[in-house]
């Protein structure tokens, strides 16, 4: 999902042709590190599409969707790439914010946010999460959206353990938490890097 504080954002994403005058500066923040989903924006920059459209785009890595939304709202960045749950949370908690970001384009057909657990934990369906210990960084989009997932699946009495992003999958692999939230493709690859086979992982997608 793309965020913006000005109508120019639509033109930036659509790569609409602008007059070849002075380059318009655009500061853009990703939701996370330079991973596969960022290719949409990085490849466009590398191929000169933004420049051809009259835009001078600076793309920075992020540290979570929540932070990206807040930085766009504050004016630190003109645009950003963030999960819809983080945007909804910002609107709910800041109804009087003067510069609330708005969504102008959806990148994913469905949110990649999910709960991941090891099969040996006995967790096989959302209801099995009741009473379990979940782990995620406080700014994780999956964690921010978990209350909606929990309500829809009647999950109760969950406790949270917070950690830095590099420790999330490590703590799951060690059994220090029962499950984690995160983007499924990122967490699955991180678990495989920690010698956890894909067939030993249970993924409970949000949608």
What are these regions (language model features)?
Residues 25, 34-60, 90-93, 144-149:
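Short, polar/charged alpha-helical segment
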Residues 23-27, 49-62, 76-78, 100, ...:
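A local structural motif
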Residues 29-34, 131-141, 153, 161-165, ...:
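Short beta-strand->loop
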Residues 17-19:
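N-terminal signal peptide c-region/cleavage motif recognized by signal peptidases
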Residues 118-133:
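Flexible hinge/capping segments at coil-to-helix
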Residues 37, 61-65, 81-93, 140, ...:
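Beta->alpha turn/N-cap motifs
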Residues 59-70, 83-85, 124, 158-174, ...:
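Short helix-initiation/N-cap motifs at beta->coil->alpha
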Residues 85-86, 167-171, 175-207:
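Pocket-lining segment of extracytoplasmic ligand-binding domains
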